[in-house]
């Protein structure tokens, strides 16, 4: 069913803080428990460095990993090559490779005043997404608010992975462009990334189940 398919697609996200504190061993531990892993390190460097780093990370058996789309097409193409080379060398299934567009902590004023980008934030995100698609990536990390325009302009098969998810009543924290799990589904998100609404909740398991149920509620089973 559609519901069981979504449950099978769930990942444990390992971010910078956990990976830098515990190292590659944490990947092995979580994989040994049967979970799929989204390694969220947002690689952004010169193309050769990103390619070599991606090869190392792919060899860990990661299921999803990302780079910064602002690194440019050449960097993203090298990342794609690194994934393919590692999979061929170690006989691994190809992980999902995605590009970060604009962080959900970025708003229009910050884009203009601090990053010196005068374009509309939606146009910037779409441009980065198109570059990621050209480079062979499987999708992008973006706000749920941008999912529909990305699917419409690129492809419905091009994945949108959307952080900035909060349950109703939760503190937004440092996120600027936030939506609920239900709204993310309405806007066409393929995956949602949920952190503090679960980890900082009084009952994390209950909040986790609320997020899942909200996101699944618009799927016709």
Give a label for each model feature:
Residues 76-82, 199-218:
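C-terminal helical cap(s) of enzyme catalytic domains, especially alpha/beta-barrels
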Residues 25-38, 82-93, 97, 150-167, ...:
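Alpha-helix-loop-beta-strand connector modules within alpha/beta enzyme cores
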Residues 12-14, 37-41, 65-67, 97-101, ...:
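Hydrophobic faces of well-ordered beta-strands that scaffold small-molecule active sites
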Residues 49-53, 60-135, 146, 157, ...:
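Conserved anion-binding
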Residues 33, 60, 135, 187-188:
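Structural motif
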